[in-house]
């Protein structure tokens, strides 16, 4: 029952790192416009 919550927490931890790394890379920004806004 707790699996989805744990996954959401893990995603919240991972996302800022992805955002920083990806959004400093123009090619990645183009591939992930919703993450880099």
Swiss-Prot record:
Q: What is the effect of changing residue 34 to A?
A: 5-fold decrease in ability to inhibit alpha-3-beta-2 nAChR, decrease in ability to inhibit alpha-6/alpha-3-beta-2-beta-3 nAChR, and loss of ability to inhibit alpha-3-beta-4 nAChR
What effect is documented for mutating residue 29 to A?
8-fold increase in ability to inhibit alpha-3-beta-2 nAChR, important decrease in ability to inhibit alpha-6/alpha-3-beta-2-beta-3 nAChR, and loss of ability to inhibit alpha-3-beta-4 nAChR
Q: What's a single GO MF annotation on this record?
A: ion channel regulator activity
Coiled-coil regions in this chain? none
Swapping residue 31 to E leads to an effect described as: 3-fold increase in ability to inhibit alpha-3-beta-2 nAChR, important decrease in ability to inhibit alpha-6/alpha-3-beta-2-beta-3 nAChR, and loss of ability to inhibit alpha-3-beta-4 nAChR
Record keywords, A-Z = Acetylcholine receptor inhibiting toxin, Amidation, Cleavage on pair of basic residues, Disulfide bond, Ion channel impairing toxin, Neurotoxin, Postsynaptic neurotoxin, Secreted, Toxin
Listed as disulfide-bonded, the cysteine pairs are 22-28, 23-36
Positions bearing the site annotation: Moderately important for binding to nAChR: 30, 35
Q: Where is this protein chiefly located?
A: secreted
Annotated site (Important for binding to nAChR): 29, 31-32
Q: In which tissues is it expressed?
A: Expressed by the venom duct.
Q: Which InterPro entries match?
A: Conotoxin_a-typ
Query: Matching Pfam families, A to Z?
Result: Toxin_8
Q: Which family does it belong to?
A: Belongs to the conotoxin A superfamily.
What's the protein name? Conotoxin Bt1.8
> From what organism does this protein derive?
Conus betulinus (Beech cone)
């Amino acid at each position: 029952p707790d699996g989805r919550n744990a996954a959401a927490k893990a995603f919240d931890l991972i996302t800022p790192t992805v955002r920083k790394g990806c959004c400093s890379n123009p090619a990645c920004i183009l591939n992930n416009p919703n993450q880099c806004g």
